[in-house]
UniProtKB/Swiss-Prot annotation:
Pfam families: ThiI, ThiI_fer, THUMP. HAMAP family: ThiI. InterPro entries: Rossmann-like_a/b/a_fold, ThiI_AANH, ThiI_fer, ThiI_N, THUMP_dom, THUMP_ThiI, tRNA_STrfase, tRNA_sulfurtransferase_ThiI. GO terms for biological process: thiamine biosynthetic process; thiamine diphosphate biosynthetic process; thiazole biosynthetic process; tRNA 4-thiouridine biosynthesis. Keywords: ATP-binding, Cytoplasm, Nucleotide-binding, RNA-binding, Thiamine biosynthesis, Transferase, tRNA-binding. Pathway: Cofactor biosynthesis; thiamine diphosphate biosynthesis. ATP binds at M183, L184, H208, F209, R265, G287, Q296. Disulfide bonds: none annotated. The gene is thiI. It comes from Ligilactobacillus salivarius (strain UCC118). This is Probable tRNA sulfurtransferase. It catalyses: [ThiI sulfur-carrier protein]-S-sulfanyl-L-cysteine + a uridine in tRNA + 2 reduced [2Fe-2S]-[ferredoxin] + ATP + H(+) = [ThiI sulfur-carrier protein]-L-cysteine + a 4-thiouridine in tRNA + 2 oxidized [2Fe-2S]-[ferredoxin] + AMP + diphosphate; [ThiS sulfur-carrier protein]-C-terminal Gly-Gly-AMP + S-sulfanyl-L-cysteinyl-[cysteine desulfurase] + AH2 = [ThiS sulfur-carrier protein]-C-terminal-Gly-aminoethanethioate + L-cysteinyl-[cysteine desulfurase] + A + AMP + 2 H(+).
Length: 405
């Protein structure tokens, strides 16, 4: 069957009232970004539907990409037919015959946005249903839970036929809920947190701390590849790498080992907040899950959060590890996340970090450091990479070797 377009139905946008146009415009932008490699597509976003005209493009490849765009409730590969009822009847029979199996049941579901068309909804249902019963021997009508629902949408520019309704990603279009920074490590949790943030419409930029020579170029590229795994949901994501070596060496030299993790993460939060302010971010997301490690107790979170007034959002905070892993597998970040490259959170990890650090002690130990100067030098060294769909950074030979370790 040669489909001519994909009809997209919106998700939560129907609840957005006066802001609906802004949401639809943003969804249209995101769909164009996600599908930019399909050169022949024509995308038209209307108030109640989006129409993606295929013009010969592979509809299955387009739909695979569409499944990852937030803000879409569902979509259907469709055939546009002239408003000639005889041509509609012929096409309807062809669509049913292609999927027909002995004993199959069906119904017709007509939706009419053009009320000037010569046949109303019930008449269209009767005309098409009767014709299919005559032309497809063995098929039966069933109004509740049929094997196939043939959808017919009557519009001013034509009649659209479809028989599949494929679930989209749901959520809200990325960018409709503002911008935030995601503290991206190389682990399992933070990419999942980023995915969940984007699902609620947040435009995220990745902030990744690296500490050469203690962390390798491959570890940095792994974080970039994790970012690339999330680009199909939005089209492109900015990756901000922050040099962290001097801060870690200084903290290790001047702070008791039990507070190393706390002070390091306070610096990370200061830096992320400063980057967010520069880049008009409204919040910070991270992958902390309560109680997983020493830095993720409530006492640790309070001691670390002490350095900022910016909202810190933790989408996976109440999830079990298995729940997080399931999402990571679904979004295809898990296998990459468990590759054994070192990151700056582990290279100077103390043998017995404080699980209940005190805010007053954290402040006291920081008095030994020139905090402002350390932060400024790190900010001066940041690099920003725009990562697009299909980008890869990890050296494949080294990647294979790492998987064998």
């Amino acid at each position: 069957m040669q489909y001519t377009e994909i009809m997209v139905r919106y998700g939560e946008l129907s609840t957005k009232g006066k802001n609906r146009k802004n949401f639809i415009d943003r969804l249209g932008f995101n769909v164009r970004e996600s599908l930019h490699s399909f050169e022949n597509l024509v995308i038209k976003a209307h108030r109640d539907r989006m129409h993606i005209q295929l013009h010969g493009e592979d509809y299955e490849a387009v739909m695979k990409r569409l499944k990852q765009v937030f803000g879409i409730q569902n979509f259907s590969p469709s055939i546009k037919v002239e408003r000639d009822i005889e041509k509609v009847k012929v096409t309807a029979v062809e669509m049913v015959k292609e999927k027909f199996k002995e004993g199959m049941t069906f119904k017709i579901n007509t939706r009419r946005s053009d009320h000037n068309y010569q046949y109303d909804t019930n008449e269209m249902n009767d005309i098409l249903g009767s014709h299919i019963l005559r032309e497809v021997p063995g098929i039966k009508v069933k109004m509740k839970n049929p094997d196939m629902t043939l959808r017919c949408e009557v519009r001013a520019d034509g009649i659209y036929l479809s028989h599949e309704k494929i679930d989209g990603a749901g959520g809200l279009p990325v960018g409709t809920a503002g911008k935030a920074m995601l503290m991206l490590s190389g682990g399992i949790d933070s990419p999942v947190a980023g995915y969940l943030a984007m699902k609620r419409g947040v435009d995220i930029e990745m902030v990744h701390f690296f500490s050469p020579p203690y962390t390798s170029e491959q570890a940095l590229n792994k974080a970039k590849d994790l970012t690339a795994k999330l680009t199909p949901y939005v089209g492109k994501i900015r990756f901000i790498q922050v040099p962290f070596t001097e801060i870690q060496e200084t903290v290790k030299e001047k702070v008791p080992s039990g507070y190393l993790m706390t002070i390091q993460r306070r610096f990370m939060l200061r830096l992320t907040e400063a980057i967010a302010q520069r880049r008009k971010g409204l919040a910070i997301f991270n992958g902390e899950a309560l109680g997983q490690v020493a830095s993720q107790t409530l006492e640790s979170m309070a001691a670390i959060n002490d350095v900022t007034t910016m909202p810190i959002l933790r989408p996976v905070v109440s999830m079990d590890k298995n729940e997080i892993i399931k999402i990571a597998q679904d979004i295809d970040t898990f296998d990459l996340s468990i590759m054994p490259f070192e990151d700056c959170c582990t290279i100077f990890a103390p043998p017995a970090p404080k699980t209940k650090p005190r805010i007053d002690k954290a402040r006291y130990y920081e008095e030994r450091l020139d905090v402002d100067a350390l932060v400024q030098r790190a900010l001066d060294g940041i690099e920003i990479t725009e990562i697009k769909i299909g980008d890869t950074f990890l050296n494949q030979e080294k990647k294979v070797f790492a998987e064998l370790l």
